[in-house]
From Swiss-Prot:
One of its GO terms (cellular component) is membrane. Its cofactor is heme. This is Cytochrome P450 monooxygenase apdB. GO terms for molecular function: heme binding; iron ion binding; monooxygenase activity; oxidoreductase activity, acting on paired donors, with incorporation or reduction of molecular oxygen. Its EC number is 1.-.-.-.
Amino acid sequence: MGFVNTLTQASDQENQRLRASPQVFKLFVLILFVLLVLKIRRHRANRITNQYGRQICELHGDARVAKFAFSKQLSDQGKALAGDEPFIIRNGRARELVVTKPEHIYDFYKGDTKPCSLLGHAVGALAGERWSMIRRYFDPAFSFQSARQAIPELSASIDRWLDDLPLQGTGTGKGFALEIKKPCRFLPLRLAAEFVYGEIFDDKLFSALLDLNVLHEVILHDVIANKRLATRLGCWFDRAAAKRMEEFRSRWMEFNLGIIQSARGASKACPAERIYHGVEKGDLKLEEFLHTLDEILFANVDVSSAVLGTLFEHLAVNTAFQQKLRAEIETHIQTRTHTPDTDSDIDINTETGKYLSKQDTLMNFAVMEAMRLSPAFDCDFAAFSLPECTAVPKEIGGYRVPARCPVVIDAKRLNADRATWGKDGDTYRPERFRDIPPSKSRYGFMRFGVGAASGRCLGKHLADTLFKLTLIAVIERYSLHSVHDGPEVELREVVVRV
């Protein structure tokens, strides 16, 4: 009987399994159907069409690496595909809308936007309450007034950089020649670090900062090449990259906390130490403090140095404009030198600050034109901005764009757009700014951002100051000349009339 019962039970279980099989199959089919419906709905929701139902153009292939490493080619491909209209590129699984015209930028910024950047907890990647709290502690150190007060220290550092310049070049008989971009490579980093860390910063700390910058660049390329590194799970698939990220976090924290401790022990002025009070009070998170310093010092190293390189290379070619600029700077030096000597240092600082603040000078035009051709937005590369997301559905360039769509700006095309800059938008002509009112270039000029977004750049006053002080110092000491058949610039000493 036991054997019979066993057979009966086995038979019953088999019958139950057979009866359950269709139910399992039906459930499986239902799940597939639901997933398919959701995918179709998501696809339809993400479709970007114009009022006639025509779908927006999309470049084939993954542009995640290309938009940084081959940005010019990608920009040209987009123009060939879509003309002056917005178009779509792929960034891994994400689709990003590329905008190129001032009217596109206006449409985009009409409502709120949300950052979608690689900057973590830095101020450039946040919004709302956390953004306001970070700015509360960082803004005083990076205000217009703070940048102007730092003129003597910044000027002294630039003079030391200039003293070393002939040693990096090759003698020409009349002067010396060098690839001007090379000595400009880390000047902005040095000046920004001295500004942030104050009196405690020295050559030894700068050497440590350069080592950190090398590691930072490797990590940036890791993240660009592998988007999964932005997630905890993704880090498990590339342990070497994850270890580099952890090493940088540890060394970056040690570097900054060590400076703060040294500044306090020596009773030396250090803006970073004052900002750190926000961490100690619990208003700032330590990672917000560290990530924002990371953004200030590392995120714009290549772009800031490119602005200086572009500035001097074009001045070397455009000698007529250079001569007019030198005459203007000589006039400023005469004014600065002949001020009443009640307190000469303060007077020189005040006069230089006034000159730097003027918007109608050839010096300002020269810097603006260099920035137009090498836009200094929050990215290490010069053509495409980091993405920001639409907060609500919008119509951009005639296309209906859904909420949460990442949008990037092709600054190369925007900064040469004929509607703003005329037919010679691709050429260097600084005096064009005399005829272009700020209202016309508000959405057509990518410097520290466009429109209201330009006000969010924490370091814009510092950048403007160091660009102009470097220009004054170079033109005061040297005339620049292009060298045929090469990338070098020849520098010849000049005597400035005072």
